[in-house]
Design a protein with these regions (language model features):
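N-terminal Rossmann-like NAD(P)+-binding subdomain of aldehyde/semialdehyde dehydrogenases
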Residues: 1-131
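Rossmann-like NAD(P) dinucleotide-binding subdomain of oxidoreductase/dehydrogenase enzymes
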Residues: 121-220
Length: 220
C-alpha cells in the first residue's frame, strides 16, 4: 500500500517543484509511501515559518501549552491504525513493536505536558548587599529534531515534545526510511490545534540528506 505525503508543515506547504521519492517496504519491495524530496531552499522556508511562529508560541502560558500537548497525545492514539500500518510498511516492523511505539510516545507527550508548569529558575548568591540575583529559563527559538527509523514514533516524538513544552517551535527532520510515519506525528499535533508554524516536518530523498540537513543546521 502506498501513502502519498503532500506536506512539510501543517499548512499544506509543498516542496518547490514536483519532487517526491518512494520508500519501499523492506520485506515485499512494494512502494510503502511517497514523500516530498525537500531541498535546502525548502528547509529555509520551513525554518522561516517556524521562526515566525516562535514569538506567539513562546508567549503562551504553561497551562495552554499543557492542554495542547494532552490533546496531541490523544490525537496520536486516535491515529493508531494509521501509525501501525505506516510503520510496518516502511520499516518492516512487527505490529506489536509499532503499537508499543505509539503507546510509549503518547505517554511521553503527556509527560512533556506535565513539565510545562515545572520550568523554574533559581536564586543566585550575590556579593552585592541587598541585591537579588536570579537565573530564568527561557525558550531559545526554533529547535531541529533529527529522528531515526528504528523506533520512529518514540524517537520522533522525543525529538519535539519537550522543546514544545518549553515554548520552542520545532522542525522534525523525518527519516528517509519512514517519512510517512514521522509525518503522521506532525499531522496529529496539527489536529490537536497547535498554531500554524509551531510544529513542522521536512523530508528528503536518500540522495539529498546532507544538503537538506546541513542547510537547516547552518540557519541562524
Amino acid at each position: 500500500m502506498s501513502d502519498s505525503i503532500d506536506t512539510f508543515t501543517r499548512q499544506d506547504m509543498a516542496p518547490s517543484g514536483p519532487r517526491t521519492f518512494d520508500r519501499r517496504n523492506p520485506l515485499t519491495g512494494e512502494v510503502a509511501s511517497s514523500a516530498p524530496a525537500h531541498d535546502a531552499a525548502d528547509a529555509r522556508e520551513v525554518a522561516d515559518a517556524a521562526a515566525a511562529a516562535f514569538p506567539g508560541w513562546s508567549a503562551l502560558g504553561p497551562n495552554p501549552r499543557r492542554a495542547l500537548l494532552n490533546k496531541a497525545a490523544a490525537a496520536l492514539e486516535a491515529r493508531a491504525n494509521a501509525f501501525v500500518e505506516a510503520m510496518m510498511n516502511e520499516t518492516g516492523s512487527t505490529e506489536g513493536w509499532a503499537r508499543f511505539n505509539l503507546m510509549l510516545a503518547a505517554g511521553m507527550v503527556r509527560e512533556a505536558g506535565a513539565l510545562t508548569t515545572q520550568i523554574g529558575g533559581e536564586v543566585i548568591p550575590s556579593d552585592k548587599p541587598g541585591c537579588l540575583a536570579m537565573a530564568l529559563r527561557e525558550p531559545v527559538g526554533v529547535i531541529l529534531g533529527i529522528a531515526p527509523w528504528n523506533a520512529p514514533i518514540i524517537l520522533g516524538v522525543r525529538a519535539i515534545a519537550v522543546p514544545l513544552a518549553c515554548g520552542n517551535t520545532v522542525i522534525l527532520k523525518a527519516s528517509e526510511t519512514c517519512p510517512r510515519t514521522h509525518s503522521l506525528i506532525v499531522e496529529a499535533f496539527a489536529e490537536a490545534g497547535f498554531p500554524e508554524g509551531v510544529v513542522n516536518v521536512v523530508s528528503n530523498a536518500p540522495r539529498l540528506p546532507v544538503n537538506t540537513t546541513v542547510a537547516m543546521c547552518l540557519l541562524p
